[in-house]
Amino acid sequence: MSRRAGTPTAKKVTQLVNVEEHVEGFRQVREAHRRELIDDYVELISDLIREVGEARQVDMAARLGVSQPTVAKMLKRLATMGLIEMIPWRGVFLTAEGEKLAQESRERHQIVENFLLVLGVSPEIARRDAEGMEHHVSEETLDAFRLFTQKHGAK
């Protein structure tokens, strides 16, 4: 019974997982959050270079909705990681490793977006939702999304 007399308590639907599983789940989420910004930046740099011929801090700040100092700080981090090269007065360029990461991120996004479209989500919402989901989906789940999409007819 619940605290209110006469009202039965609802059964618990889920059980608490063991400690190791719980820890691993939270570790994976933290790792996904860490990778999320990195992926977004390298993908944006790649897109800007492809679409407008250059990637400038001012353009990145505008598209990400952040300040230029925030972009500058992240670019230093990406350079330290070996993902980009910054050339004064010329812009930001991806290294081979950075371009590979951008391509992988773009593919993950497309798989998730196509899956959402097959489910009937509108194109605008599918694009937006995929932007957040792509970073938090395992390879196994991506493979399942890809297979489902192929079976049910999308791009």
Swiss-Prot record:
Coiled-coil residue spans: none
PANTHER family the UniProt entry points to: IRON (METAL) DEPENDENT REPRESSOR, DTXR FAMILY, TRANSCRIPTIONAL REGULATOR MNTR
Entry keyword annotation includes tRNA-binding: no
Summary of the function given for this chain in its UniProt record: In the presence of manganese, represses expression of mntH and mntS. Up-regulates expression of mntP.
Location in or out of the cell: Cytoplasm
Signal peptide (from-to): none
Classification via SMART domains: HTH_DTXR (SM00529)
Protein name: Transcriptional regulator MntR
InterPro entries: DtxR_MntR_Metal-Reg, Fe_dep_repressor, Fe_dep_repressor_sf, HTH_DTXR, Iron_dep_repressor, WH-like_DNA-bd_sf, WH_DNA-bd_sf
Family under the similarity heading: Belongs to the DtxR/MntR family.
Subunit (UniProt): Homodimer.
Domain HTH dtxR-type: 34-95
GO cellular component, one term: cytoplasm
GO molecular function terms noted in the UniProt entry: DNA binding; DNA-binding transcription factor activity; manganese ion binding; protein dimerization activity
Keywords attached to this entry: Activator, Cytoplasm, DNA-binding, Manganese, Repressor, Transcription, Transcription regulation
One Pfam family it belongs to: Fe_dep_repress
Free-text note on domains in this protein's UniProt record: It contains an N-terminal DNA-binding domain and a metal-binding domain.
Native species: Escherichia coli (strain K12)
One of the GO BP terms on file: positive regulation of DNA-templated transcription initiation
